[in-house]
């Protein structure tokens, strides 16, 4: 009985530790160095995939909402 309980607690602790590890997107990729084209490496799109999260929109894009703290959702101008 005690062995089953200890095993359960051990597995629960391992699961809790694994859940706390950040994924690739949350591990700092949002704030990585810009690509040669000037775009920042962001991990998500916005507006159902019709926009990109950027710090500044390009000339042919317009801001269409916010993604995160200092990021704008930029969509192509029509």
Curated annotation (Swiss-Prot):
Disulfide bonds join 43-74, 53-67, 57-73. It comes from the Eukaryota. InterPro entries: Beta_defensin_dom. GO terms for cellular component: extracellular region. The keyword Secreted applies. It is found in: Secreted. The keyword Disulfide bond applies. GO terms for biological process: defense response to bacterium; innate immune response. Residues 1-27 form the signal peptide. Keywords: Antibiotic, Antimicrobial, Defensin, Disulfide bond, Secreted, Signal. Pfam families: Defensin_beta_2 (PF13841). Has antimicrobial activity. Belongs to the beta-defensin family. This is Beta-defensin 105A. It comes from Gorilla gorilla gorilla. The lineage of its organism: Eukaryota, Metazoa, Chordata, Craniata, Vertebrata. The gene is DEFB105A.
């Amino acid at each position: 009985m005690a062995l089953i309980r200890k095993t359960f607690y051990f597995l629960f602790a391992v699961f809790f530790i694994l859940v706390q590890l950040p994924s690739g997107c949350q591990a700092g990729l949002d704030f990585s160095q810009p690509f040669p084209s000037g775009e920042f490496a962001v991990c998500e799109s916005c507006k159902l995939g019709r926009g990109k999260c950027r710090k500044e929109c390009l000339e042919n894009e317009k801001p269409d909402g916010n993604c995160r703290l200092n990021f704008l959702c930029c969509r192509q101008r029509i």
